[in-house]
């Protein structure tokens, strides 16, 4: 059955085309003679994206529901797994396990921060993700409709990792307040403050 065919595809990326919109929710044509319909609810949409009839939509399958005519795939453009999936395709070093995505934080439509780690010293994880002249990361940005993407080096030392995470802001000092609760204080100059806290203090 279609349900069995697609249930293992949850977490995978699928491509379809904008069909219609109702109350902000988008219905996506996935082919298959209309038996498989894509549904992109408002809550799963990236805030700054706008679609018109027949626009191509690449999205993550997050759930499946039966319908009278077949099945409906619940899609997401805001899930951070969409970013990791696109990145895995663009960066061979992630695909073969040399570079590992350790963490992703995403404010869909605005900015994504990705922490990466290399299992081999001679491979720069950030450079691998960015690519020569930024080609690889530009392909990811294009797929996410120009969302800003920061790639940073993961570090097992929390102090160093926090400094990397707040880059490009210059951090003078990091004080670990509570390691168990993962609370820390980063000290920066006044001129670096807005850069460090990001949009609306994020």
Give, region by region, the residue ranges found by the protein language model:
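RNA-contacting regions in translation and RNA-metabolism proteins
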Residues: 1-202
